[in-house]
Amino acid sequence: MPYEHQQIEQKWQKFWDDNQTFATSDTTDKPKYYAVDMFPYPSGQGLHVGHPEGYTATDIMSRFKRAKGFNVLHPMGWDAFGLPAEQYAMKTGHNPADFTSQNIDHFREQIKSLGLSYDWNREINTTDPSYYKWTQWIFEKLYEKGLAYESNMMVNWDPIDRVVLANEEVIDGKSERSGNKVERKALRQWVLKITAYADRLVDDLDDLDWPEAIKEQQRNWIGRSKGAAVFFNVDHADAKIEVYTTRPDTLFGATYMVLAPEHELVDSIVTAEQKQAVADYRAAIAAKSDLERTDLNKDKTGVFTGAYGINPINGEKLPIWIADYVLASYGTGAIMAVPAHDDRDFEFAKKFDLAIKPVIAGGENDDVAYTGDGVHINSDFLDGLDKATAIDQAIDWLEAHQAGHAQTNFRLRDWIFSRQRYWGEPIPVIHWEDGTTSLVPENELPLLLPHATELRPSGSGESPLANLTDWLEVTRDDGVKGRRETNTMPQWAGSSWYFLRYIDPHNDHQLADPEKLKYWMNVDLYVGGAEHAVLHLLYARFWHKFLYDLGVVPTKEPFQKLVNQGMILGANHEKMSKSKGNVVNPDDIVREYGADTLRVYEMFMGPLTQSKPWSEEGITGSRRWLDRVWRLLIDDEGQLRDHVTTVNPGDLDKIYHQTVKKVTDDLENMRFNTAISQMMVFVNDAYKSDALPVTYMNGFIQLLAPFAPHLAEELWVRLGNRESISYVSWPTYDDTKLVDDTVEIIFQVNGKVRGKATVARDINQDDMITAAKADDNVQNFITGKTVRKVIAIPGKFVNIVVS
């Protein structure tokens, strides 16, 4: 009887559903294990074969930990707000909720077909009002603590359609949808003060079991640096420019200054002669994104303001320019330029014929900036000093002369939290006509997103919610009129805390029960793509730390261990994409080969964290191996083979116990590919055996179960077991069976190998010597000669010295 994967997989998926096999209890004395996948955005395309890789990894660990006696929480949900659903709705005239619901149903069906052991009773959906009630509640707490504020921020603006565009909707400076040229425009936004947590977000990375590359990306994104704030008076003006620099020791080398075109002082310091040039330049760069402006490879542009700053350390006048490579949102929006020792400043100075003054010894080429270390030159009281000493003395001088002070800075900017979109969590704020702002009362949460069938831009830059006047306009008891906030939250909001809601998803009175949070947190294993290294992971850590400060959660960090699965590439080693025609649909694989085959193949392709190309040969090879496992135990009539027996002749002892040890060790370290390799070795040896001890077959099927759960459940029952394999205790190994009872020793005559033999491991020296002298080849070299000496090392060799 062949291995009928469709019948077997449907049977056991129904069994797991009917019996709530993977429902998790909160009341147990077992140790806990909490495994979370980065939950998916339910797109219209459905799953691709990259999704099951990470999901299978967490599922294997969850099944393994259950068998090891842990109480496992392994949930799934949907990050379901997002731009694509709104774009689809605007094209079709449908509400995005309907489209999203259909997509979720499709995703759920696909995921269930993979045999993943999720507790579906804990399923969450970020668009569910019972969920986003608590997203809104967190926002209100941030607002109450002064961590949510309003500010005018630059956005992408389509001046024809009069709509704000997300960065991904702007292609080559034009709207992807309309083709109109995009401008940059200041618009009122809600902002979260993530910078208040910058130090803790850096320092606490040291306590996490995360890939070092991810931690380094977060450190770089936060960009903590120590330096100095330096104040430059503007010549002949009542104005002062503050600059932050990590190298105050190079002040003597500053030869010009640059302000961001949007800097608040530009209008007040620009001279009449330069006013038009400055205005023209600002207009020319208005549509550029921050990314375009700071591209290191682009041609440097800028305009002189006509004004000069006074270098506080030597009194020199420095021309003040504006240039797009300086951003108003970064630092103070102003820099002091030291072109002799900074590549970008050097290129700018060369293009505009500005002075270049070396202050660090070591540069030998006038055609490039010298960015290395060296002693200071041309720097007055800093001459001859090394970098560290010079920095300290420069800061001391600035502070003594009230021209600056030591300062720690961060590259991290506050989080622009609002979106001019319909399909997002409503921000629970009301703006009153008397100029005040208030939160929606907590007992009135959730503030529901109103149903709308026609989504069209407001024309004002506000979201389509501005068109829904019945929802928008409110009146207080005292007759004061107000408007609800029309911005909605970004998709990052719901994903910043969802792992907490899994713990208590049906609680109407709290975000989650404190005792349950105390039991389950932290997340023991968090698996997802490295593309979320910064934004999602940083935002989730920020919110978690804030909730910790409120006393809502018991831990400082949400995710103790993070694993990034590698990308599954097309067969040609390129990223899978519809345009390249190399996307593999997992539904097709499950239908033709089975979910267990897909699971085994994706884990066998290579180390989990490495990118790997898809291979049709590989998937068929994995299927052939599962067929071999089936045929090892089941005959052509579908019966258990006769040589599966209660008798153990001992020939599989070593390989079985080696396999249990190897697979167990590999699972603890998530080395799934080598665990499968070891199981393949065991199957090969089992095929050579005349008798298959049922205890060893049971143990092997338990090892296989996390990888191929449907097949394992079926074979487990056919081996005579009654309960589901899911909670059966993990097999153990016997250390004494891991080594051979015999050992190979070599026989030497005068130090040259003349023979070898397999002997008992505990053989004594006398018996070793007897065996050596009895060896036919050894006898050829010692017969007729005098034995001078015999050296015998137990378990190693015998050396007979003759003459």
Curated annotation (Swiss-Prot):
Its Enzyme Commission number? Answer: 6.1.1.4
Keywords (alphabetical) are: Aminoacyl-tRNA synthetase, ATP-binding, Cytoplasm, Ligase, Nucleotide-binding, Protein biosynthesis
Q: Which GO terms describe its cellular component?
A: cytosol
On the tree of life, the source organism's domain of life is: Bacteria
Record bears the keyword Aminoacyl-tRNA synthetase: yes
Identify the main location.
cytoplasm
- The residues that the entry says bind ATP are K578
- Record's subcellular location: Cytoplasm
Family named by the database record = Belongs to the class-I aminoacyl-tRNA synthetase family.
> What is the recorded name of this protein?
Leucine--tRNA ligase
The scientific name of the source species is: Leuconostoc citreum (strain KM20)
What gene is behind this protein?
A: leuS
